Amino acid sequence: MSRLIEQIKQKDACAFTHGGKFHADDVFSSALLLYINPEISITRGNSVPDDFTGIVFDIGRGEFDHHQKDSRIRENGVPYAAFGLLWEAVGADILGEELAVKFDESFVQPLDNNDNTGEKNELATLIGNFNPSWDYEGGSDEAFFQAVSVAGMILENKFERYRGNERADKRVEEVVLALPSSRCIRCAICLSLSGTSKE
């Protein structure tokens, strides 16, 4: 279990992110933390309190922020955003190493890229539409946590889909390997199954 997972799972765990207008990056980061610990307290604000000792993301220029000059970039050129930085730290604990990489490639990276470059992404647009209108009388926190709730459902379903596909692949592989047919046929079937966990 990673150090961050242990910190997130603490009974009095807390996290801090920026206030104001929100994006898919900070929303899915929050949903990920809540997936790991539904009781974690997430606070939004314009600056990180000096005495804050919890997890800080998408603000503060720390480990899980990407707004500094030396922000990290993946080997394939896709820059990390907060969601990607958090996923890198906890993904293997949630899905295992192999599926965590696939999930990063197919789900996390498009959102990170949208946040960093503005490249169009329908899911990011959907989440962004939860931001209240200019003349909304209330604050943005209520809308933010509504968006986090939706993002949480998406994450849960995605995780289960990945796990389900992996279980199906393993089951089919077991059946194929038990067949008395030739090795070539078995190899062809196994090769055709590779990558089916990508969703």
Predicted regions and their residues:
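Glycine-rich, Lys/Arg-enriched anion-binding loops that position phosphate/diphosphate groups
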Residues: G118-E199
